[in-house]
């Protein structure tokens, strides 16, 4: 039997992250999503590390403010996701991401300097979302978010 060199993920150090599907609904009822563009050419969700002593919600609110300059309100949790990544110092680590559906005022996005791996932040209308190049997990999260927003906005 060949020796298995794959690492058992449960033994790896965990990095907690918070991410958000950020939507805005303007006075005309137009729903838009705030997305960030990464250096690999994909539109993705703004996310960042949760500090020690912060709840996933608090960390996500702080990170979105730092990364794209928006004050967000958490509507509900969308789910969690975990993947193994390579850290320059620690080697292999588990990244555990908490995703939230969040709402914000429609205002210009300001991508912070030094947000590693990101080169753009932009709002997209609902109709533009299917055209975007996105990761599968992001597509699923946005699809779930759209369903929830449709239900929320129908109620008002």
Where are these predicted regions, by residue range?
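Short connector loops at helix/strand junctions that flank enzyme active sites
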Residues: 15-18, 40, 94-97
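Short, acidic/hydrophobic/Gly-rich beta-strand patch recurrent on exposed beta strands
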Residues: 34-37
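Unchanged
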Residues: 50-140
